[in-house]
């Protein structure tokens, strides 16, 4: 399909990762391209489709931002990997290990003795005016004494073929989960050649990554968690992925508090100590008490807990200072001062504008330099949030211009050269820094360097490191012994997660009930047409009671319910399967696309049935696949409570003395009990059979009594609140509900206090929320 002599156009003299200037393949690519030549267009499309489908099924996405609106988009995989020889990779790894050691020493100086400023090695203004240098942390030594545990670096190859470090990702490095998913997806595209070639595996690195976290809490005397900004953050997929992969709690700032100098998580079991926090928020937002006072992402008092060495933060707060572009002008000299070595991997040639010697040169060479804010952390060719307007010239950096190397991208059924950068990851281990033998490459959508941004249509590729050794055999098996106890964080349920699971159960059940009522109404509308019918009037009144009568009303109500369920589910994606999330996501999309097209009658009934099946699929997946931890119990509590409340609403109307003909059949249909009606009552729907099936039957999962007993059972299974009075209040409320429900046997159903039972159940819901969710 392709050879070195085909029309693969290089961009001038810019180095290409696949093809050398003489037209031959680089050694790392030769075997892969021999394989590629044998693939035809149809085979290629089929393979690429498998990789893309895997990513969709796994729920891998990124957030796209446009005009203030963020949307989820499919992960843009460049299906061809980038291949590098192990020898070249080793050179890069050695350089980055040295750089990681240098950055650690800089952190210790910046927040310690500050000798580099005192000795004139760096300008005081570059540190003192840096917004990421957090003064309250000066003099603070982290628990374990190390500041940095996990790093990422962006690299690019310049015109001469040398690799340059474009950015140090220290504050909250992202991308490692995407790198792993890229690997899985790409091996689905090219399973045969991947197995045939000797490609370095990623599993050993992730094993060491896991051990790094375990080593930070060897006594296993507390929890470990990821501190995330929440679902609207562009990296949220990765946060949930890593939480599930490493067995960490997924936490937001409001999930934490500080008690007597100790960081604790608010859980349904009470306050539990947190020993390790992998933060995915910028340091300035971590503690509104001492840092950014209007932050809603952090936890007041966190710095106090760090001072008492009660918690380890990965990476240390304040490490964002190392990402500033200004240090690229000083790192070569600082490496000599601190490590007594030459810097192995250099940045782009950079100068601080405050250097008088450079200012005298600049006017003659200004076309050779890119000018940017000194404290920016973006790649030099990316759009910057910082403006140069009004900035002190001493706070500006000049860097040499760069043309990135290119790599193959498959577009319009042919390979074309596109600019690329490389992201590499490092983790601290007891034996020193370990470099992941892979990573990901960002591929441009055009020949411009800034087109590598995902926001501009860039794509992402897996990176294969070709070796002459047999691939490592390594299984990420679960740890044993005491460490396994540390990883059972899925049993620890944050209060906020319990709240969201409870309401997820309620929203999905309410949506199920509304869809059933709408379907029943439109089925009868198709039967009776425009002729007035008391049963149609009855179903209309029920729809009005649910707020979904007019077409635009039921569209907005269903969209609201689906959106609310999505919002709750997005907060707890680490608590249930990808399949469950994808079904809910598809249901939300289908409601928004199908509901506006719905017409009255049979057409509507058919479309509503399709939506109802999606809703039932989610409930089935959760019921069958979700582990019976506390989270499942709170979700089930919400589901059972909402099912009772819905039954009470429509039975109050359909069992009334003035209910129209056909009301009993409608009640049975809404209760999804037609089959059992036929098997037990010969299909005869009357008040007796309806009450038996939908109120009293302890074996019918749709009946009120079945779900009330379920409520009682679930309440016994969730942790008891330490406040015995609150427990007693909930017990008394359920006892009142039981008394009201049993009163039917004495007084019949005509005088049954539907409203009293509904109101008492809502009181129980409020008590549950107050006890566990605040």
Predicted regions, residues:
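N-terminal low-complexity, Ser/Thr- and acidic-residue-enriched intrinsically disordered segments
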Residues: 2-87, 91
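Short glycine-rich loop/turn motifs
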Residues: 150-153, 421
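Catalytic core of tubulin tyrosine ligase-like
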Residues: 142, 334-477
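ATP-binding N-terminal substructure of ATP-dependent carboxylate-amine bond-forming enzymes
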Residues: 2-27, 149, 157-164, 168-312, ...
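Alpha-helical transmembrane segments and their helix-helix packing motifs
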Residues: 55-147, 158-160, 170-224, 230-241, ...
């Amino acid at each position: 399909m392709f050879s070195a002599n085909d029309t693969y156009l290089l961009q001038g003299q810019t180095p290409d990762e696949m093809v050398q200037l003489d037209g031959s393949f680089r050694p790392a690519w030769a075997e892969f391209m021999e394989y590629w030549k044998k693939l035809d267009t149809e085979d290629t499309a089929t393979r690429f489709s498998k990789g893309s489908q895997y990513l969709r099924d796994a729920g891998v996405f990124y957030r796209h931002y446009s005009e203030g609106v963020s949307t989820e988009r499919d992960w843009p995989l460049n299906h061809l990997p980038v291949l590098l020889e192990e020898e070249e990779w080793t050179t890069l790894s050695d350089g980055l290990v040295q750089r990681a050691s240098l950055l650690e020493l800089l952190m210790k100086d910046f927040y310690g003795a500050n000798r580099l400023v005192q000795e004139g090695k760096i300008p005081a203004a570059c540190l003192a005016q840096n917004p990421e240098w957090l003064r309250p942390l000066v003099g603070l030594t982290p628990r374990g004494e190390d500041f940095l545990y996990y790093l990422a670096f962006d690299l690019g190859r310049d015109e001469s073929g040398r690799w340059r470090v474009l950015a140090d990702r220290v504050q909250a490095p992202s991308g490692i989960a995407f790198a792993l998913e890229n690997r899985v997806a790409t091996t689905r595209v090219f399973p045969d050649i991947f197995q045939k070639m000797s490609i370095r595996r990623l599993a050993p690195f992730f094993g060491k990554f896991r051990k790094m976290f375990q080593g930070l809490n060897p006594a296993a005397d507390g929890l470990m968690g990821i501190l995330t900004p929440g679902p609207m953050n562009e990296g949220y997929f990765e946060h949930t992925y890593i939480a599930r992969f490493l067995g960490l709690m997924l936490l937001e700032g409001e999930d934490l508090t500080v008690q007597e100098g100790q960081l604790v998580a608010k859980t349904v079991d009470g306050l539990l100590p947190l020993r390790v926090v992998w933060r995915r928020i910028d340091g300035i937002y971590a503690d509104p008490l001492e840092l950014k006072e209007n932050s809603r992402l952090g936890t007041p008092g966190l710095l106090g807990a760090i001072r008492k060495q009660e918690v380890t933060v990965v990476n240390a707060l304040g490490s964002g200072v190392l990402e500033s572009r200004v240090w690229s002008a000083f790192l070569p000299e600082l490496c000599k001062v601190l490590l007594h070595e030459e810097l192995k991997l250099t940045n782009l040639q950079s100068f601080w504008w405050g250097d008088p010697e450079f200012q005298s040169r600049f006017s003659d060479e200004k076309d050779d330099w890119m000018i940017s804010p000194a404290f920016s952390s973006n790649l030099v060719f990316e759009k910057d949030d910082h403006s140069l307007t009004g900035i002190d010239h001493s706070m500006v950096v000049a860097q040499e211009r760069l043309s990135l190397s290119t790599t193959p991208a498959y577009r319009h059924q042919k390979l074309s050269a596109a600019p690329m950068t490389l992201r590499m990851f490092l983790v601290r281990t007891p034996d020193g820094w370990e470099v992941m033998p892979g990573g990901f490459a960002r591929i441009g959508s055009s020949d411009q360097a800034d087109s590598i941004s995902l926001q501009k249509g860039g794509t992402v590729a897996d990176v294969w490191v070709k070796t002459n050794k047999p691939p490592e055999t390594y299984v990420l098996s679960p740890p044993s012994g005491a460490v396994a106890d540390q990883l059972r964080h899925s049993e620890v349920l944050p209060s906020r997660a319990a709240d969201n699971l409870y309401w997820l159960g309620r929203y999905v059940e309410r949506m199920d009930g509304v869809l059933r009522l709408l379907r029943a109404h439109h089925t009868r509308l198709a039967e009776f047409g425009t002729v007035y019918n008391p049963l149609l009037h009855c179903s209309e009144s029920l729809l009005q009671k649910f707020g979904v009568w007019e077409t635009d009303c039921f569209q907005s109500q269903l969209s609201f319910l689906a959106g609310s369920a999505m919002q709750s589910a997005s907060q707890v994606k680490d608590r249930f399967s990808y399949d469950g999330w994808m079904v809910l996501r598809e249901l939300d999309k289908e409601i928004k696309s199908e509901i506006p097209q719905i017409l009255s009658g049979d057409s509507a009934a058919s479309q509503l049935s399709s939506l109802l099946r999606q809703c039932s699929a989610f409930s089935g997946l959760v019921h069958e696949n979700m582990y019976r931890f506390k989270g499942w119990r709170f979700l089930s509590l919400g589901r059972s409570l909402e099912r009772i409340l819905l039954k009470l609403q429509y039975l109050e109307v359909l069992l009334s003395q003035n209910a129209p003909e056909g009301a009993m059949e409608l009640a049975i249909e809404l209760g999804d009990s037609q089959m059992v009606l036929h098997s037990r009552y010969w299909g005869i729907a009357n008040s007796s059979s309806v009450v038996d099936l939908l109120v009293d039957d302890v074996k019918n999962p749709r009946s009120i009594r079945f779900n009330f007993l379920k409520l009682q059972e679930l309440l016994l299974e969730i942790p008891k609140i330490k406040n015995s009075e609150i427990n007693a209040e909930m017990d008394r409320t359920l006892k009142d509900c039981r008394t009201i429900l049993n009163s039917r046997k004495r007084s019949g159903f005509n005088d049954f206090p539907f409203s009293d039972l509904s109101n008492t159940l809502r009181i129980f819901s409020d008590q549950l929320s107050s006890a566990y969710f605040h």
